[in-house]
């Protein structure tokens, strides 16, 4: 579930050596499954361990994860990196904002996961987003653009060369195309 590099493990052991005996770490997600999700690591003294915590054993310490955070920490990695500017602990949790869906989930759930975890973060740099409206019987994903994408002069290129290409590669036997149903209104909100 959570991978902690050897350098990060050594860093945690060093930090925990200054704490009361029996103290471990807690890895958590605040507001999991939302766009505001934030991950964190804190000390976890013995009296803060909950009955529904999942405990992961590492070299010299354990990591506790609460039941609510657990599904959002799938594939999370913690590393301790050093460069010219100094050292820092990095925590990457690709599923923190949206729970990873299983391979047998419905097509719309799997497409929605890709939209939220991969496509919308890219569109967010232009203040835009898309949402899945429906999937037609013909296998066409009907999308609606929002934010800076609404009225953008590049929306057709984004749709055909970006989003449609990506979704067709990921769901080749299930999707046949992508359609935009947005009533585009160019305005101050539009990118470009």
Swiss-Prot record:
GO BP of this protein: iron-sulfur cluster assembly; protein maturation
Names of required cofactors: [4Fe-4S] cluster
GO function term, MF aspect, one: iron ion binding
Pfam families per UniProt: Fe-S_biosyn, NifU
Manner of cofactor binding, per the entry note: Binds 1 [4Fe-4S] cluster per subunit. The cluster is presumably bound at the interface of two monomers.
InterPro entries, per database record: Fe/S_biogenesis_protein_NfuA, FeS_biogenesis, FSCA_dom_sf, HesB-like_dom_sf, NIF_FeS_clus_asmbl_NifU_C
Keyword annotations of the record: 4Fe-4S, Iron, Iron-sulfur, Metal-binding
Residues the record lists as binding [4Fe-4S] cluster: 149, 152
Protein family (similarity comment): Belongs to the NfuA family.
Protein function: Involved in iron-sulfur cluster biogenesis. Binds a 4Fe-4S cluster, can transfer this cluster to apoproteins, and thereby intervenes in the maturation of Fe/S proteins. Could also act as a scaffold/chaperone for damaged Fe/S proteins.
Quaternary structure and interacting proteins, as annotated: Homodimer.
Record PANTHER family: FE_S BIOGENESIS PROTEIN NFUA, IRON-SULFUR CLUSTER SCAFFOLD PROTEIN NFU-RELATED
Record-given protein name: Fe/S biogenesis protein NfuA
Natural source organism: Shewanella halifaxensis (strain HAW-EB4)
